[in-house]
Amino acid sequence: MAQKPNFLKKLISAGLVTASTATIVASFAGSAMGAAIQQNRTTNAVATTVDGVGFDQTAVPANVAVPLNAVITAGVNKGITLNTPAGSFNGLFLNTANNLDVTVREDTTLGFITNVVNNANHFNLMLNAGKTLTITGQGITNVQAAATKNANNVVAQVNNGAAIDNNDLQGVGRIDCGAAASTLVFNLANPTTQKAPLILGDNAVIVNGANGTLNVTNGFIKVSSKSFATVNVINIGDGQGIMFNTDADNVNTLNLQANGATITFNGTDGTGRLVLLSKNAAATDFNVTGSLGGNLKGIIEFNTVAVNGQLKANAGANAAVIGTNNGAGRAAGFVVSVDNGKVATIDGQVYAKDMVIQSANAVGQVNFRHIVDVGTDGTTAFKTAASKVAITQNSNFGTTDFGNLAAQIIVPNTMTLNGNFTGDASNPGNTAGVITFDANGTLASASADANVAVTNNITAIEASGAGVVQLSGTHAAELRLGNAGSVFKLADGTVINGKVNQTALVGGALAAGTITLDGSATITGDIGNAGGAAALQGITLANDATKTLTLGGANIIGANGGTINFQANGGTIKLTSTQNNIVVDFDLAIATDQTGVVDASSLTNAQTLTINGKIGTVGANNKTLGQFNIGSSKTVLSDGDVAINELVIGNNGAVQFAHNTYLITRTTNAAGQGKIIFNPVVNNNTTLATGTNLGSATNPLAEINFGSKGAANVDTVLNVGKGVNLYATNITTTDANVGSFIFNAGGTNIVSGTVGGQQGNKFNTVALDNGTTVKFLGNATFNGNTTIAANSTLQIGGNYTADFVASADGTGIVEFVNTGPITVTLNKQAAPVNALKQITVSGPGNVVINEIGNAGNYHGAVTDTIAFENSSLGAVVFLPRGIPFNDAGNRIPLTIKSTVGNKTATGFDVPSVIVLGVDSVIADGQVIGDQNNIVGLGLGSDNDIIVNATTLYAGIGTINNNQGTVTLSGGIPNTPGTVYGLGTGIGASKFKQVTFTTDYNNLGNIIATNATINDGVTVTTGGIAGIGFDGKITLGSVNGNGNVRFVDGILSHSTSMIGTTKANNGTVTYLGNAFVGNIGDSDTPVASVRFTGSDGGAGLQGNIYSQVIDFGTYNLGISNSNVILGGGTTAINGKINLRTNTLTFASGTSTWGNNTSIETTLTLANGNIGNIVILEGAQVNATTTGTTTIKVQDNANANFSGTQTYTLIQGGARFNGTLGGPNFVVTGSNRFVNYGLIRAANQDYVITRTNNAENVVTNDIANSSFGGAPGVGQNVTTFVNATNTAAYNNLLLAKNSANSANFVGAIVTDTSAAITNAQLDVAKDIQAQLGNRLGALRYLGTPETAEMAGPEAGAIPAAVAAGDEAVDNVAYGIWAKPFYTDAHQSKKGGLAGYKAKTTGVVIGLDTLANDNLMIGAAIGITKTDIKHQDYKKGDKTDVNGFSFSLYGAQQLVKNFFAQGSAIFSLNQVKNKSQRYFFDANGNMSKQIAAGHYDNMTFGGNLTVGYDYNAMQGVLVTPMAGLSYLKSSDENYKETGTTVANKQVNSKFSDRTDLIVGAKVAGSTMNITDLAVYPEVHAFVVHKVTGRLSKTQSVLDGQVTPCISQPDRTAKTSYNLGLSASIRSDAKMEYGIGYDAQISSKYTAHQGTLKVRVNF
């Protein structure tokens, strides 16, 4: 027989492989791998055991055990005993026509069990106690069958060499589980599936199943005998299964798990399957004791495809049949399979994690008689074809997929269905599945996540009977109502993404049911739009103002009388469809006034929203909808009364009203947006209920329109209730002459906007009645009449056009309330119209009443009274042509009244009435104004007014210049007539002629081309109504003896003229202050002109020719460019203010009294000066006059030299007197000139102007911080003498001394001395660092000083800085020494100080040329920041330097030495200096003058010294030497300012210093392996010779340069310092030092660090 692989032998021998494992492996090794020849053993005539007895064995050896994996062929009618421990055989082959017993005495594995050649007979299997028979079903191939060998190793073909199929178990007959526990295992080598299971036929039956265990570990087994259900334990492994397709008992019932039997699913995943098939003439009812599946294991399938069947809990329907609870006790799955017309009934509770309902063909039905619950994470899937599922109890289907099938779930009365239902999970675009509620019920989510939809693209949710179906969560489904009593109740937050009542119920019809809300909800589709009974009876909103029903459909259709109910607390309906027109065919019922909202704010102007129903209640107890927001839609309110508290209209939105009654408490709209349309197509009337407001004053509607009636052109009548207001930019009519307004409810109505006239279309008529007041605030155009009755008032605020305006009962009033000018246009009438009670003017705007047409000569409006009231002061009414002021020719007298007074913030004003085209006579006693309410009368044409009233409480004016004649004859003896002005004011239109025939007091203006004061008549003019005179007054009608008197404050126009008809006649008297025009002329002077007021003043604007001119004590102001005084005598005894004009004395003698003085103004900008000219023939006599005041407005340029002159009195030889001392009052920006008054040689008086800039600026500088600067005075003189520079001209704009000093001082001083000194100090610092290095290296050749060699000193301003380096033991080295210096030079000798901060580093390389000579080279890099102080504070300088040096030291005779260095450095200097600039107004701003230039500095030093050991550990080294440095700056030009950039010339500076001092070094101190060398030093540095050259600089245009300030710094300075060096070894050395440099007003502190590498 085939041999096992060695590794398997070892495993088995070691006891590490179980019998079943070994069997599988052996089978695989012998068959699948083909590792051995297939063996066959055939039974013979004796009893057969596989240990070797009864088989076709060889003679020797005999009775050899049947090899493993051999085929056992039953060749004789003898039983077979399997007694090989852990035996494993390829299979049993029945080759005898007998039923054979096979006893299993040891655990055995068998492959196939076939009766292929004797199919009428079977193997009966008997399992001994505790034994396991494992069946693998392993077949053999034809190759194996043909090559099979017997025990003699001779080929003995099995099945004649034909293959035996895998899983061929046709030979299995009775399986006896014995008297004690035994196990049957199906572990198929080639596993079968549910679709192609291993079938155990009818002969395969179980005996003694109560002792057996059946394990299905690999494969799917289908059994035909109900005896398998008697097995004590059936274990089904993961992915494996057993199918009961059993024979029938007497009631076609299969009992499962009876008598303590169990079916378990023992795999890790619990995916084993139990299939129960219902079939004809076999088991159709499956009674289950206990429950199938559990612990989330086991998939149970109930299949009634062939015949109706029941799966029943043996304990009753209230017991679980699948699983045990909805948590961990659930089965893994439950599958129900049905077919068309077939029913599967589950009579027990079902708890399965995943449930499948599948129908082979539509429509199978599944009835659940009790709870179905898949748990919180469970699923339900509908598959294959549509099916119908009916539940009877509350159930949870979990996540349910209808699989795009027309499946239906039916929920009975009062039950709840939980789940999350999807029409087609694999294709979300498909819609499938219906959930039908028989009556009351609830559909709820099975998910804890509120975002998970309850239904998603299922076909429908149906309420088929009377009852309430409660929905919550999100749904994508149609809602269908099948009974008038059907109700869908939507919980708060419910979303219905679908339609309502669009499609008939499954097996039923739609009905007018109801939807109610517990809170907010959304329905996205149409409602009730399928016609017929599809319309809804009602929708009831939640009783909560915060809750919203969102409707996304285009058709919201209610049944006849259907309502959308807003409960007591309101709520909101939100319409969201933006793609379609929307129809709402419901009444909107409001429970509480001003509650509820309809929100259509998202609608666009392309959409029409139609409400075919009532909204609220209009009546004694109004119940208004709180708000209706139409968005931008076109909304039609077409059927029923409407009551809305707030109508919100979005941009471009429109609302159409029909023939009903509308109460709109207010509208909300953006200004100029929104449209209301009246289109009553039924009865031609629209009624606006009391309290309606369309638009508002602040936000009027864009338009209110009367819609078209088409060809019928029938009038549309708007009945306007009490308090109704219409506000719109335009109120229009589509059809011409259509649209009438009836205001008859009393109260006040406002109509605001342009009414009619658009596109030429006029409205029809207006009727007022019942005491109603109507305000038309805008233009209004009507083709028909306007009637006003029963004490009603028409208030007009804009242009108004009508056929006529009348009052049949004489009680109607027209009131003008306009604020601007308006025109009322009426038609001439063929017959008289009924008179108005009154025309009232209440607004400040003018009113023109105009008449057109030629129908007749009667006026379109008549009244006997015009009244000015309220705000009409200043308003003007133009009466129609032909109506005069008097009553002649009028049917009724004309009265003009006023209650508005005449006082305004700016003075006197009146309301006025203008007539035209007719002459008027005003009789004495006619009522026109009163003493406290003066009115105005005017002529609008060239007609006459005769005034016969003694007192006329009116002023008279004319509209057109040089038109109109007024004759004033009202005066009587001893009582002058009174009138309140003739003309409205200077500059206004003049009367053509005014004639005074009697004495008069004119309490206003005279504005006339000519006003004649008849001979002997005296007119006093000016008063409360005006003080102006413009035109001409003629004194006398023939003899020139008329008289005019002007009251205080009279204002005559400069061109006005008072003349006389006869020379030297007529008088003119001024009773107070006056502006005077022209009086008389050289040929016809008047008799006298007198100024009689006390302390008055006269502004002379024209020439005066009079025999006598007496100005009294008046102060005279010359207000024209040349005023001439001529005639006989002139008396002046006050101030003469010439301003910039000329007063000419042309003739006669002028006498000036003691109070006479002269004031004049000199304007340098144009050279104008007020002056006096005394012509020949004139004489001025004066004693010494008062102070001569000369006002100078001097903004002129002072860029001149010498003196300028201006004449004050010309013809001074004819001036007999002396002017008083001058008082100059200079204004303007020029401080740089002096003024004087002199009398020239020709006796003229002359004003002088002299340049004084040098003295002014010198004083300004002296009193400023620049005052002490050396040499500044010379530079100031140089600057002010260069008058051609832009800087000089800019200086002349300085307003004060401080600005002047800062401007000039910044230019004439500089910082060059400070910069040069700072640069030289940096060079000396670098020389000091070189001296330090030399002092160290010279000790290399001096052994006697080695002990005392001290460390390097700090930086000093000489090459002999004390403190030399410590001893070097090498010939050369490289070193670097960074340093930092902070220096402060205070102000000294007037020279501004500075603060300088320098950072730098010196790097050197040197070597010993011999024992006594050292040489080296070094570079230095420095940066110096200088901040200048004192009067140069704000100036800054940056210096960046680079230097190259050579240095050396020579040891002389013992202890004497000499050392020196040479340096060459280049420096880049960036200087920023503050300058100033004045704008045209003299405002000073700061600017920066930037100068960039290069500097070169070079020099050298030489020092000698002596080392002296003063005592042990102390070395004293006195030193002395000289240092020389020279510095050179290049030329440069500043930039950055407007007028103050300077050109700076190059300069050279040098200095030679004597240096004397000493240093003291101590002996070395050793600290923790470090050698420390201390040192102190002191030196005196004295400047021997040298100079700091002065910088020369010039401005553009300047010739003589400014010279910089000289150096005033101290010549002697003192240096004190100390340092220490630290060595860690011979190569590396570090150091630190400090030095102080002190001189007069100068202090510098320097710190140094050192690092040195010795080679």
Curated annotation (Swiss-Prot):
Coiled coil: none annotated. Gene3D superfamilies: Autotransporter beta-domain. Changing K78N: In strain: Indian tick typhus. Residues 1367-1655 form the Autotransporter domain. InterPro entries: Autotransporte_beta, Autotransporte_beta_dom_sf, OM_autotransptr_brl_dom, OmpB_passenger_Rickettsia, OmpB_ricketsia. GO terms for cellular component: cell outer membrane; cell surface; extracellular region; periplasmic space. Residues 1335-1362 form a propeptide. SMART domains: Autotransporter. PROSITE patterns: AUTOTRANSPORTER. The 120 kDa surface-exposed protein is a major structural protein which may play a role as a rickettsial virulence factor and/or immunogen during infection. This is Outer membrane protein B. The lineage of its organism: Bacteria, Pseudomonadati, Pseudomonadota, Alphaproteobacteria, Rickettsiales. The gene is ompB.
